[in-house]
From Swiss-Prot:
Keywords: Host cytoplasm, Host Golgi apparatus, Virion, Virion tegument. It comes from the Viruses. Its main location: virion. The lineage of its organism: Viruses, Duplodnaviria, Heunggongvirae, Peploviricota, Herviviricetes. Pfam families: Herpes_UL7. This is Cytoplasmic envelopment protein 1. InterPro entries: Herpes_UL7 (IPR002600). It comes from Epstein-Barr virus (strain B95-8) (HHV-4).
Length: 278
C-alpha cells in the first residue's frame, strides 16, 4: 500500500488522483501508543466545546507532542468501500480487511492533524452542525497546505463522514444555506430510512442490505473481549493490548470480534507506513 516511489508527472499521477476520488473512506481511526509492555489504541480527545468550537491550539499541541513522543506508533486506519460499510456490519472478508488496515505515521504535522480530526469525527457521540462545519473548515485548510494524495484521501474521507453525520442526524434541518456536504455513506441513508419502516419490511430489508456474516460474530463487550485476547496471546506477544473509543454512530464496527483481533495484531506487530497512497 505504501512505498517510497515518487509519482512522475503525467498520466500515472492523473490515474492515481482519479483513484483517490473513488468512494473509499478511511475508517476506524485511532491513535496507537506503546510503552513497556502496554499497547493502547485510543480515540483522540475531544478538542471542542459544547457549541462545537474547535480548540485548535490544544489540538495542534497534542499532535505535535505525538510527533516527538517515543511511545507514539501512528494512527491505525482501514480503507473501506462505500458498499462494505453497513453501519452495524462489515461486508468484507477478514483477509481483505486485514490487508486494508495500516499503521500510518506521516512525517507531516498537517497530515497528523487530519488523522486526529478523523478520529474525533468518528467518536463524536452528539455531533452538532457547528462542529461539523468547524472541522470541515480546518480540514480544508490543512489539505491546502499539503496538497498531496494522502491529504486528498483524508480530506475526501473526512468530508464523507461529516456529511454522513449531518444527514443521518438531520443537523442542517431548517438551515437557510446548505453546507458543502456530499451524499455521505449510502448505506447509512438506508439504515436511517429503515428505522421508520414497519417492522416486517424493516427486518427483511436489513437482512438483505445491511447484514453480512463475512466478518463473524459481534463481541458482547469489546473491552472484555480484548482482555480475553490478552490472556490467550500475551505469552506469545509479550504485550497487553487496550482499546478505548466512544460508542457512536461511526464506531459500531469495534464490536466485531474479527475487527478487534485484526486491530490488536496490527497495533502490536505491524510496521508503520509514512504514505497511504504510494
Amino acid at each position: 500500500m505504501a512505498s517510497g516511489k515518487h509519482h512522475q508527472p503525467g498520466g500515472t499521477r492523473s490515474l492515481t488522483m482519479q483513484k483517490v476520488s473513488l468512494r473509499v473512506t478511511p475508517r476506524l481511526v485511532l491513535e496507537v501508543n506503546r510503552h513497556n509492555a502496554i499497547c493502547v489504541a485510543t480515540n483522540v480527545p475531544e478538542f471542542y466545546n459544547a457549541r462545537g468550537d474547535l480548540n485548535i491550539r490544544d489540538l495542534r499541541a497534542h499532535v505535535k507532542a505525538r510527533m516527538i513522543s517515543s511511545q507514539f506508533c501512528g494512527y491505525v486506519l482501514v480503507s473501506l468501500l462505500d458498499s462494505e460499510d453497513q453501519v452495524d456490519h462489515l461486508n468484507i472478508f477478514p483477509h481483505v480487511f486485514s490487508e486494508r488496515m495500516i499503521l500510518y505515521k506521516p512525517n507531516n504535522v498537517n497530515l497528523m492533524e487530519m488523522c486526529a480530526l478523523l478520529s474525533m469525527i468518528e467518536n463524536a457521540k452528539s455531533p452538532s452542525i457547528g462542529l461539523c462545519r468547524e472541522v470541515l473548515g480546518r480540514l480544508t485548510l490543512l489539505h491546502s497546505k499539503c496538497n498531496n494524495l494522502d491529504s486528498l484521501f483524508l480530506y475526501n474521507g473526512a468530508r464523507t463522514l461529516l456529511s454522513t453525520l449531518v444527514k443521518y442526524h438531520d443537523l442542517e434541518e431548517g438551515a437557510a444555506t446548505p453546507g458543502p456536504w456530499n451524499e455521505g455513506l449510502s448505506l447509512f441513508k438506508l439504515h436511517k430510512e429503515l428505522k421508520r419502516a414497519p417492522s416486517e419490511a424493516r427486518d427483511l430489508m436489513q437482512s438483505l442490505f445491511l447484514t453480512s456474516g463475512k466478518m463473524g460474530c459481534l463481541a458482547r463487550s469489546p473491552k472484555d473481549y480484548c482482555a480475553d485476547l490478552n490472556k490467550e496471546e500475551d505469552a506469545n506477544s509479550g504485550f497487553t493490548f487496550n482499546l478505548f473509543y466512544q460508542d457512536s454512530l461511526l464506531t459500531k464496527h469495534f464490536q466485531c470480534q474479527t475487527v478487534l483481533q485484526t486491530l490488536r495484531r496490527k497495533c502490536l506487530g505491524s510496521d508503520t507506513v509514512s504514505k497511504i497512497i504510494p
